[in-house]
A protein has these predicted regions:
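Extended aliphatic helical segments
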Residues: 1, 15-16, 37, 92-93, ...
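Active-site nucleophilic cysteine motif
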Residues: 29-37, 68-83
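Short, low-complexity, Pro/Ser/Thr/Gly-rich segments in the mature regions of secreted, periplasmic
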Residues: 144-158
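Intrinsically disordered, low-complexity segments enriched in small/polar residues
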Residues: 66-68, 131-134, 139, 153-156
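Hydrophobic/aromatic-rich core segments of domains that either
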Residues: 74-143
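Repeated polar recognition positions within modular binding domains
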Residues: 44-47, 55-56, 66-67, 109-110, ...
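Arginine residue identity/basic-tract feature
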Residues: 2, 6-9, 21, 58, ...
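Secondary-structure boundary elements
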Residues: 2-64
């Protein structure tokens, strides 16, 4: 997949035009973006982004939207890219949640989700069914450790 940020922008414009109507509210458009990512992305653990690479969040969004495959980072970045396209200012969260996938002794595993205006969104948790209902939630709803957040537009974060 060619990691071209112009291609990401054009792809997001096309998706948003296909899944929204002019009479929809901004929140209705966000729900349409959420549904699109959940219903058009298949889980694949074949690719993990290098979180130290410049623009990893944009490259991950492009890879996921272009191939229809991704892990939690892919779901989060794809949703953030579409949310950005409709005028939101999303943050991609890189954190840890209870789990055993990483084999860490503390019982936590890597995970990624999105925060918009202080509210949490977990498209991969919803799609896979292990952490449903985290859509515009005031809290994440389970123990978590936030390691860093990245503003999708600027790349700034902690």
């Amino acid at each position: 997949v060619k990691n071209d940020m112009r291609s990401l922008k054009l792809h997001c414009i096309g998706v948003v035009q296909n899944i929204t109507r002019s009479g929809m509210s901004k929140s209705q458009k966000l729900q349409a973006c959420w549904s699109y990512v959940i219903n058009n992305t298949y889980y694949s653990s074949a690719y993990y982004p290098n979180l130290n690479q410049n623009d990893w969040w944009r490259m991950t969004a492009w890879r996921t939207l272009a191939t229809g495959k991704g892990n939690c980072y892919g779901y989060a970045c794809a949703f953030a890219a579409l949310a950005r396209e409709i005028g939101y200012d999303p943050y991609v969260v890189c954190g840890r949640v209870p789990g055993t996938r990483d084999g860490a002794g503390d019982g936590f595993t890597r995970h990624s989700w999105v925060i918009i205006n202080g509210l949490h969104y977990d498209p991969e948790g919803q799609a896979k069914g292990w952490h449903t209902g985290v859509y515009g939630s005031y809290s994440y709803g389970m123990d978590n450790q936030i390691q860093k957040t990245v503003n999708f537009r600027t790349g700034r974060g902690n």
